[in-house]
């Protein structure tokens, strides 16, 4: 449903933001 789609999108956004942050901190 719609809520599942929103949760999936939020999870993806959170994961990519976490990856970017990790790259800044550790230099990938």
Curated annotation (Swiss-Prot):
InterPro entries: Antimicrobial_frog_2
Disulfide bonds: 23-28
Protein keywords: Amphibian defense peptide, Antibiotic, Antimicrobial, Disulfide bond, Secreted
Annotated Pfam families: Antimicrobial_2
Tissue occurrence: Expressed by the skin glands.
Record function comment: Has antibacterial activity.
Protein name, as recorded: Ranatuerin-2LTa
Organism encoding this protein: Rana latastei
Source lineage: Eukaryota, Metazoa, Chordata, Craniata, Vertebrata
